[in-house]
């Protein structure tokens, strides 16, 4: 941040704004998005962006890939790829199923790739001089940014990943009085997002957002008459079947690697025939 030759931007995951307030005496779950954006500017970031922007990109890409696999005979079931802890687990314990993983990057990495290609070009900034910092609820994100395949612009998509608690410590270390800050907005254009992006952070949210988008792509109409509540909630494994146009789509959502492993073993043994599986490494 103090290097005048670096253009430093920050992105924040949707879960962070609902957890950060606890570090400053707010009730659990309080949305402190506005104060968080203000604090990040006081720290010295050049731009303050929202990972929800990239979550929407991920949803569109993942839904497109799902529709293509279903209609053109691609590898099924397709498995979500936004959880780095799950990806690493799959690579180690289910290497024969890595082709089932979606080709989409996680929202964090997709944001970094967009920032260092599209946004850097628009701003006239060399990607090598841009530093992308991500504030995430997941420590596995620190591993994800170092993967060899996460460098769309020839440099790491994301340079630094910190947790919600680490951000809180940084705010306190900078002497910022969090509760006195006036609410501020994210910067544009990488600071906008939809409700679909917000639910991305909850188990079942990726599935619901992608399915709603896929319904629109296949039928040309909104999914208003399709109830996706079966994939929500805190159960370790959730299953549901939906009629999407002329297609029968069977889906499953696994919370935690133990439940994900149970699902994949069923697929390997021919005991289950899913179209789409969402997995999150965290329980």
Language-model features: locations:
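Iron-sulfur-associated redox domains of electron-transfer enzymes in respiratory
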Residues: 1-283
């Amino acid at each position: 941040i103090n290097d005048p030759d670096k253009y430093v931007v920050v992105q924040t995951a949707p879960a962070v704004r609902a957890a950060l307030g606890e570090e400053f005496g707010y009730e659990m779950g309080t949305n402190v998005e506005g104060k968080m954006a203000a604090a990040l500017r006081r720290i010295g970031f050049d731009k303050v962006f929202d990972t929800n922007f990239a979550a929407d990109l991920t949803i569109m890409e993942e839904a497109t890939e799902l529709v293509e696999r279903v209609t053109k005979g691609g590898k099924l079931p397709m498995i979500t790829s936004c959880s780095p802890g799950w990806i690493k687990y799959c690579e180690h314990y289910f290497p024969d199923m890595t082709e089932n993983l979606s080709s989409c990057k996680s929202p964090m990495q997709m944001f970094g790739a967009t920032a260092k290609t599209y946004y850097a070009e628009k701003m006239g900034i060399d990607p090598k001089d841009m530093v992308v910092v991500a504030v995430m609820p997941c420590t596995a994100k620190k591993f994800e940014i170092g993967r060899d395949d996460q460098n769309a612009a020839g440099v790491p998509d994301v340079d630094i990943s910190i947790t919600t608690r680490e951000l809180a410590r940084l705010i306190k270390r900078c002497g910022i009085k969090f509760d006195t800050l006036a609410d501020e907005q994210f910067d544009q254009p990488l600071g906008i997002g939809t409700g679909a992006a917000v639910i991305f952070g909850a188990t079942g949210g990726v599935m619901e957002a992608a399915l709603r988008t896929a319904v629109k792509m296949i039928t040309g109409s909104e999914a208003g008459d399709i109830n996706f509540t079966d994939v929500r909630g805190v159960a370790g494994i959730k299953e549901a079947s939906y009629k999407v146009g002329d297609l029968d789509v069977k889906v499953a959502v696994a919370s935690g690697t133990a439940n994900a492993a149970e699902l994949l073993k069923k697929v390997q043994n021919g005991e289950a025939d899913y179209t789409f599986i969402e997995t999150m490494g965290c329980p």
